[in-house]
Regions:
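Mid/C-terminal beta-alpha module of Rossmann-like enzyme folds, strongest
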Residues: 220, 227, 240-296, 323, ...
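Conserved Rossmann-fold NAD(P)-dependent oxidoreductase catalytic core, especially the SDR/UDP-sugar
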Residues: 33, 101-105, 109, 125-170
Length: 339
């Protein structure tokens, strides 16, 4: 039974980290412990907590710089072992324990413009180091739908076999490099893996719906030029990511992770109705967008647990009460690759 609303961040995160029965079963049958590299991002803490709740007998290890005050202590309070390390350091990587299951979540997107050198280091150099260091592990890597080109909005979305030829922009191309570096070492060393080409996870504190809702409340126009997007509840995305550890391939291969596509206009109209405001639109829908085909994920995992109408209800309620925000816009409307 899904809640009607979240009274607090704690209640939100408790719901978001509740594992499915399928995940509990998957991790029960998965040999070895799990280490999350780059656990300190938007999704990492809840993924680690979900893993621990699903498999309390396993070691769940989170690795990050832990620059956010209180994050390490919060994770430890939920039974997650924490190791402070810089993943760009060979020496610090060498000191990490040998763990058979790796979830790689490190990367850089927001603020990429103006410091492209750091974007490429985080998204290409670090993956090469990690691939070498953990060649004997399974590696599930968080990637992005941005590795694909824009596709016709009537096409059903890019499948995993689509060419990795994104539109101009250094961020998207650095993400192709991340996959290609992991893929190189997977071919050379036989490392099993999977690239999670994620499209827009939804948390009440950030995400496409959060961005739209904030603009509606502020009376700002909604740009329709990127008129379509795939979105998925972050709890579902984390659940699928952890279950993917049982579906790694050698050599590593892609897997699209998201929910069905939405129309930005329709989502904004639905949120505006719930918020009691009138939407203001600007621009017109382009005939192409970053859309993914999720048939393979649906075959492996079944449909997402949380439907769109529930995400809309939750988002409108959260924003109307001026609850917490991460202050990290998705820039879903960007078509020029600049973030």
């Amino acid at each position: 039974m899904l809640p009607r609303r979240f009274a607090s961040v704690e209640e939100l995160e408790d719901t978001m980290t509740t594992p499915s029965a399928a995940l509990v079963d998957t991790l029960k049958n998965l040999p070895g412990d799990i280490m999350v590299l780059g656990v300190g991002g938007k999704m990492g803490p809840t993924l680690a907590r979900m893993a621990k709740r699903a498999a309390p007998g396993k070691r769940i290890i989170g690795v990050a710089r832990f620059s956010e005050p209180g994050l390490q202590q919060a994770l430890q309070s939920h039974g997650i072992e924490c190791i402070t390390a810089d993943l760009s350091s060979r020496e610090e990587l060498a000191r990490l324990p040998d763990i058979p299951n790796i979830v790689f979540m490190a990367g850089r997107k927001f603020g990429s413009s103006g410091s492209e050198w750091l974007t490429w280091a985080m998204n290409a150099y670090v993956p090469a180091l990690v691939a070498e260091r953990f060649s004997q592990s399974r590696i599930v890597t968080f990637s992005t739908a941005c590795v694909y080109p824009f596709v016709d909005v009537t096409s059903g979305g890019a499948s995993e076999s689509a060419p990795l030829t994104p539109p101009p922009g250094e961020y998207a191309n650095s993400c192709v490099a991340r996959e290609r570096l992991f893929q190189h070492f997977s071919h050379q060393l036989g490392t099993p893996g999977r690239f999670l080409r994620l499209s827009y996870a939804i948390d009440m504190r950030y995400g496409v719906l959060h961005d739209i809702g904030k603009k509606l409340i502020a009376g700002e126009p909604i740009d329709l030029s990127m008129g379509h997007a795939n979105i998925i509840w972050q709890g579902d995305a984390n659940d699928w990511a952890l279950r993917t550890l049982a579906h790694c391939t050698a050599p590593a291969s892609g897997l699209n992770i998201s929910g069905p596509p939405i129309l930005i206009r329709d989502a904004a109209t639905a949120l505006a109705s719930r918020l009691g405001v009138q939407p203001i639109f600007t621009g017109t829908e382009a005939p192409t967008a970053w859309l993914v085909n999720i048939d393979e994920a649906l075959r492996l995992f079944g449909p997402p647990h949380v439907p769109l109408d529930t995400l809309l209800d939750w988002t409108a309620d959260w924003i109307s009460r001026d609850m917490a925000s991460l202050g990290k816009p998705t820039h879903y409307e960007a078509r020029d690759g600049r973030y």
